[in-house]
Amino acid sequence: MRRIKPFLGALLLGVCMFLTACSGQKEGGETKQKTASSAESSQGEEKKETSAVIPIMYSNLVDEETRNRVSAALKNAGLKDEKITDFFLAVDEYNNAVGKENLVQKTTMTDGPFPSMDSDRLIDLWLQNGGFVGRNCRITSFSLMGDFIAVKNPAAGDTTMLFSDFEAIGKKHLFQGEERKKFDTLFSYIDVTNTHDTKELAKEIIASWKKKGISFHNDKMHMLSVFMTMDDGKNQVQEFIGHTGILLEDGDHYLFVEKLAFELPYQVEEFRSRQEVNDYLMACYDKDADGLTAKPVIFEDDQVMKEYRVLE
């Protein structure tokens, strides 16, 4: 089996376990200023500027207020009632398994740029329940966004590393027939040039999706995908969606809905701007301090996020 670069860990789910590792981002009780480089829309061309990663508001969807906000935003985006119901059933399945008392009880502001949780305890509780097959970020995003994604030329490509996704899909009887083909095509790994040039990588991702006829059709709900690099030094270099979530409009704010990993919670963050969303994701997932691979590239639907920039 092919091996992901060390900063991603042994399995894909390790990508999402950033919470403990990122707890050292604060200094002296204040959030550090970080230099950032922005990329032009759909190009990945960087330009220098400065930004601060700020504290965020987040919830594990235990409280009714946040659940109602998310439900209303999903409904406003045109999601079917049965899909909204299914989403909250999945949320409750996880929350009940690990115990709601072990999650934040209401919308909470972080002390720094990242939510804090006892991830080891949550994993232990998850395992005590048999490590039940739940949902990860990709399954969650597709469950919410799938009706608004078109794939004209399904071609699964390399899905070797999606074995955990496929196990969950099979046991939960999710995504049958054409829907399953769509999932496999969307999340399959993409062969790319061996380069650290995010502009070039973005072009190759866009070209691959265009060839497959992948398009998104919702102006109130968007899938944000964090593309990462698979390079074991022996096989073809590939880009893959290491994390994904759903961005929703909520008045003049934004809600980002994500499932951190099979064994970690559902989480909803509130942001004042799309730039804050990008900076949060880059702070979470740009963990290759040694520069062994290219920087992550964040897509909004089928194009590079306009607010994409790298935090240094």
Stretches found by the model and what they are:
Residues M1-L11:
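Bacterial N-terminal signal peptides that target proteins for export
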Residues K26-L61:
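N-terminal, intrinsically disordered, polar/charged segments of Gram-positive cell-envelope systems
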Residues L255-K259, R272-E312:
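Low-complexity, Gly/Ser/Thr/Pro-rich intrinsically disordered linker/tail segments
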Residues K48-L79, L255:
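Compositional signal for N-terminal targeting/processing segments
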Residues R69, A73-M230, Q238-G242, E249-L264:
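Acidic/His-rich structured neighborhood in mature extracellular/periplasmic domains
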Residues L264-R274:
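A short, polar/proline- and glycine-enriched secondary-structure boundary/capping micro-motif
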Residues F18-A21:
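C-terminal motif of bacterial Sec signal peptides marking the signal peptidase cleavage site
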